[in-house]
């Protein structure tokens, strides 16, 4: 594979490299078999391989031969096959074939992604999860419209094959991919036989297909957004009484009236910013309502025409930040005006100026969090704490640890907000629910539990607040923490409540369009 990388670096015609012979290399399947063993041992036990079973490369080659001899006309119109290649029980041989196919296809993909993003400049880091936080802090306050789009998981197999065909010149290497995709589609339990649903599982094959599909969408979309957001540079121009504008000459475009020779100068800022996290993509736009409306209709049409993919209207939601709050990452996102008092001293005179700046202000959604806690039986719909009956069979330490973990995750997750006072209400609900759960377990009252356990009741639980009161966190540090936000890069994975709340928000939007 290193030879393919060197070949792609030296020769620009790396698309014509032949990948099909790699499917018959035994070393390739040895690597894929090791990947399968490592993944199985780390996640779940292997049920289909015993200690006496030996991996046979001849069986793998027979499976590849079966792929070559398949009748594609039967695969297209028959729902099931008596000898499926994609085993739903996840056998070692079918997984090795998928791993080997993934390793082969990753060779040109890695070369293409490496040399295609070099010319994208500031757009090259929009795929990283770490880019979402600079986007919110730097780009979000300077935008007046935000569009949130859900990237669908339902993809037709032929769309995936044609996506690979655009940058792989070796057509025979795509026949195994087409056969496996159609057979997986036919063996699926979904009633929609015309599409393939890429599952959200940690399978290297499906993750590679999903990442390649999203990369193809973004590589075209971002280039169009970049082209539309940057104007043509001009070499000269006259500005009477505005000589300080000569530094902004590159952000100026010129257009002429049809019936007049007078030229009109206008400023144009780079006003479109894009970022993606998970299955959601955010586009922040600074412009008029007409411009936002055009982009809202352009994005679904772009996906329909280029990828033959239908986007429902509720998948593209645009919000005006001055009037509404957008929901993302489990926060209510808004922009508020922040007054600043600037004092300037020149010689013996003191000048005071009042400035107003836009500041990004994420809000903790207290009411939705209480609604989710009520669904998990920690409180009722009004926020009144109740006992967690399903945890009464656990030990006292386990109960305290579980409540402690919930509160720690919530406080850690919403540390990116200034106003965390509403979290104390959540703390009250969890602490009282913990006390009621212990009282229900010991068949007593909350007063008796507090009297018996005393300060030991919450010694292990809800320790995050005590960490802020500890000596390393002085009063000045605590006051500074109220004025500063701390974004943690692991928040998209640690809080299932945020994902559940996002699903509820999506369902509400879908119901509005169904009415």
Curated annotation (Swiss-Prot):
The keyword Chloroplast applies. It holds the Pfam family Intron_maturas2. It is found in: Plastid, Chloroplast. InterPro entries: Domain_X, Maturase_MatK, Maturase_MatK_N. It comes from Picea sitchensis (Sitka spruce). Belongs to the intron maturase 2 family. MatK subfamily. GO terms for molecular function: RNA binding. This is Maturase K. Usually encoded in the trnK tRNA gene intron. Probably assists in splicing its own and other chloroplast group II introns. GO terms for cellular component: chloroplast. One of its GO terms (biological process) is mRNA processing. Keywords: Chloroplast, mRNA processing, Plastid, RNA-binding, tRNA processing. The keyword Chloroplast applies. The gene is matK.
């Amino acid at each position: 594979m290193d030879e393919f990388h060197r070949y792609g670096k030296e020769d620009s015609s790396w698309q014509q490299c032949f990948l099909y012979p790699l499917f018959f290399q035994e070393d390739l399947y040895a690597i894929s078999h090791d990947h399968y063993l490592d993944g199985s041992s780390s996640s779940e036990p292997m049920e289909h391989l015993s200690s006496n079973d030996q991996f046979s490369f001849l069986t793998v080659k027979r499976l590849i031969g079966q792929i070559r001899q398949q009748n594609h006309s039967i695969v297209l119109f028959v729902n099931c096959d008596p000898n499926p290649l994609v085993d739903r029980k996840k056998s070692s041989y079918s997984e090795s074939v998928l791993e080997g196919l993934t390793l082969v296809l990753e060779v040109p993909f890695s070369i293409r992604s490496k040399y295609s993003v070099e010319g994208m400049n500031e757009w090259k880091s929009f795929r990283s999860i770490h880019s979402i936080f600079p986007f919110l802090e730097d780009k979000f306050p300077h935008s007046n419209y935000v569009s949130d789009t859900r990237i669908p998981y339902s993809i037709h197999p032929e769309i995936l094959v044609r996506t690979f065909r655009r940058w792989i010149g070796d057509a025979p290497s795509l026949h195994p991919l087409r056969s496996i995709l159609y057979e997986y589609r036919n063996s699926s339990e979904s009633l929609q036989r015309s599409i393939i649903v890429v599952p959200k599982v940690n399978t290297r094959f499906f993750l590679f297909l999903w990442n390649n599909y999203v990369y193809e969408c973004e590589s075209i979309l971002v280039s169009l957004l970049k082209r539309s957001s940057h104007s043509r540079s001009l070499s000269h121009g006259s500005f009477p009484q505005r000589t300080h504008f000569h530094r902004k000459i590159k952000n100026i475009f010129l257009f002429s009236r049809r019936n007049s020779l007078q030229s009109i100068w206008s400023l144009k800022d780079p006003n479109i910013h894009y970022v993606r996290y998970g299955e959601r993509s955010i586009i922040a736009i600074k412009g008029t309502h007409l411009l936002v409306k055009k982009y809202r209709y352009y994005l679904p049409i772009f996906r329909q025409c280029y990828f033959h993919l239908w986007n429902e209207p509720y998948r593209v939601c645009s919000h005006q930040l001055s009037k509404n709050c957008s929901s993302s990452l489990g926060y209510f996102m808004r922009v508020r005006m922040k007054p600043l008092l600037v004092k300037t001293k020149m010689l013996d005179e003191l000048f005071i100026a009042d400035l107003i700046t836009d500041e990004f202000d994420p809000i903790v959604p207290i009411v939705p969090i209480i609604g989710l806690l009520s669904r998990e039986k920690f409180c009722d719909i009004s926020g009144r704490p109740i006992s967690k009956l399903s945890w009464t069979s656990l030990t006292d330490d386990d109960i305290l640890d579980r409540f402690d973990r919930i509160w720690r995750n919530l406080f850690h997750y919403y540390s990116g907000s200034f106003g965390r006072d509403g979290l104390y209400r959540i703390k009250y609900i969890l602490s009282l629910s913990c006390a009621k759960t212990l009282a229900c377990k010991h068949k007593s009252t909350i007063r008796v539990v507090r009297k018996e356990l005393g300060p030991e009741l919450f010694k292990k639980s809800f320790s995050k607040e005590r960490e802020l009161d500890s000596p390393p966190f002085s009063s000045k540090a605590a006051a500074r923490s109220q004025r500063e936000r701390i974004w943690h890069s692991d928040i998209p994975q640690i809080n299932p409540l945020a994902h559940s709340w996002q699903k509820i928000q999506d369902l509400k939007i879908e119901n509005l369009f169904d009415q």
